[in-house]
Amino acid sequence: MIGILGGMGTQAGLDFCNKLAKINAGKLDQQYPMFVLYNKSNIPKRPENLKKYYNVLDSLVEGCKMLQKNNCKFIVMPCNTAHYWYDDLRKKVKIPILSMPKEVYLDTSKNCKKNSKIGILSTEATLSTKVYNKYFDKNFNLVSPNKNLQKNSVNKSIKLVKMGKIKEAEKAIRPAVSYLMKIKCKKIILGCTELPIAIFAYKSFKKIKQSKVFVDPNLLLANISMKKYKRF
């Protein structure tokens, strides 16, 4: 079984489950993958608790151990910022935990030349903790929007998705996407699991979607999870 530690936020966890089901859609119920979603919505807010490291870590460990206890073979976390705690979390849990940033890096390495400009849209916490820079800085030029766009476009869009206002979120993210396209990024990582919900919900960004510039870490993680699941 696949263990999914959700609740960071709830919409992102459900989005992951939906993608997991669509990837391996079967004609019978028995052909779908078995998974456990723990929507642990009481995990302390990641961006606000970077300095209270162990508050978040302890809650993540508790969630992972529950999935481990329920016979899951491996765990995924549909939250980019949560991977700031990944290294310590992995030490405290006996079953494997897939790394979303690492999988995104490996996929990008297959599709982009070395030193390519790669855009990232994410929370300020994901940017400040450098969970993607850890992998990308060696071989790519990772760029993000300026402070004004981060505040008024990216942060706003993420907040709107969490509130369930998807149409407003899609409108809010447009300026940040336009900026990264203007500076000719080869790929744009949707480095917050709320952002694909905003971007792919409507017909906007049609040309960009067709060019496959967007990287959806949730979708990528779902694909990797299915491959791993089938090996058990």
Predicted regions mapped to residue ranges:
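Non-catalytic structural scaffold of enzyme domains
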Residues: M1-F232
